[in-house]
Amino acid sequence: MAALDLSKGRDVEYAAGLALALSRDSSRSQPIADDLEKRFPEDTFAKFTYVPVLRALSALEDGKPTDGVERLQIALPYQLAVTGLNFNHFYLGGLHSAYVRGEALLAARRYAEAAAEFQKILDHRGIVGSDPIGALAHVQLGRAFVLSGDKIKAKTAYMDFLTLWKDADPDIPILTQARAEYAKL
């Protein structure tokens, strides 16, 4: 939120809104989505990526994964686009719609479709750059495979993540979760 005190730029607002939405705080992320929609009605990334991602995350928080998937339909033609905002190979927004669509599809128990969304992220590493969704897609892909009953592919996805994060601090929550989930396989 401190970033919003310094700037009301489109990308700063989206980054703050995304952090809030991923933290399941739609009471604060949705006013940001409203503001982006109001101030940037013709902006391609605001209209077709940023706002739909924030709205879909809110739908997920509300337990409405199908609504989340529907809200992201508008983003499909733009999901491989790059905003032009690059922080040392961190492209803000690139494939966020695919990641959130994958989460929504998992919640809707559409596991094969969810796996395809997470695989899309892994297949386009150049767009994702060092965005955390690049690593997290491995975990989510593993989860999709577990839920669809394919333990062999799940093990591979989890191992890919654990290899990427082999030097990470050992108490990071997603890492401990991934290790525990992998151990159950």
Go through each PLM region and give its residues.
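Structural signature of alpha-solenoid helical repeat scaffolds
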Residues: L4, D43-T44, H89, G129, ...
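Amphipathic alpha-helical segments of tetratricopeptide repeats
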Residues: M1-D5, D34-P41, Q73-L85, A116-G126, ...
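TPR/Sel1-like alpha-solenoid repeat signature
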Residues: P52, A59, R71, A98-L105, ...
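TPR/TPR-like (Sel1-like) alpha-helical repeat modules
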Residues: A21, Q73-L76, Q119, V146, ...
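"A position-specific structural signal for the A-helix of alpha-solenoid helical repeats
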Residues: A15, A19, T49-Y50, L54, ...
